[in-house]
Amino acid sequence: MKELSKFDKEYLLGTIRDIKNFPKPGIIFKDITTLLGNAKAFKFLLDHLEDRYKDENLDFIVGIESRGFILGAALSARLNLGFVPVRKPNKLPYITISQKYSLEYGFDEVEMHIDAFDSIKNPKVLLVDDLIATGGTAKASSQLLKKLGVNLVEACFLVDLVELGGSKELKSECPVYSVLEV
């Protein structure tokens, strides 16, 4: 599977805005809306992801709420694949299956429709989100996919906040690809 050159990574990273002290003091938020609003950069990113995954014989793209929906749905349209959302609790209207995960203080949960992959036996799936930090949501999502019996080919992120260790943690569950590592 293909990766970007250092020059191309610098180009994409330059289209992402840093917001200091958001959502709380001490945090530098990676705002991808500036990349999404730049038609050339967004197309470049999608061209790269399409090229990386076009020969993987995937059946579905799974996107993690909420910015994973943007990237995942766009990529699924490019690859002519179905898109399946991973949602926060009580957001899906049909019967769901869930996976809890730990937060610094407490727990959270992700859900999917229980029949999301019923149309294909042992589907090959790509998990997509905009960013991986500590990896809690991504790991819970990968565990949820395993409960549903899918073949998780890879988890793909636009940005990996490497020092927070999420991608390293997730590699115990599945292969991980990050377009940009910061």
Swiss-Prot record:
Question: What Pfam families would the database entry show?
Answer: Pribosyltran (PF00156)
Q: Where in the cell is it found?
A: Cytoplasm
Alphabetically, which GO biological process terms does the record hold?
A: adenine salvage; AMP salvage; purine ribonucleoside salvage
The reaction(s) catalysed by this protein are: AMP + diphosphate = 5-phospho-alpha-D-ribose 1-diphosphate + adenine
Q: Phosphoprotein: is it a keyword of this entry? A: no
TM ranges are none
Organism domain of life: Bacteria
| Listed pathway(s) | Purine metabolism; AMP biosynthesis via salvage pathway; AMP from adenine: step 1/1
Outline the subunit composition.
Homodimer.
Q: What is the name attached to this protein's record? A: Adenine phosphoribosyltransferase
The encoding gene is apt
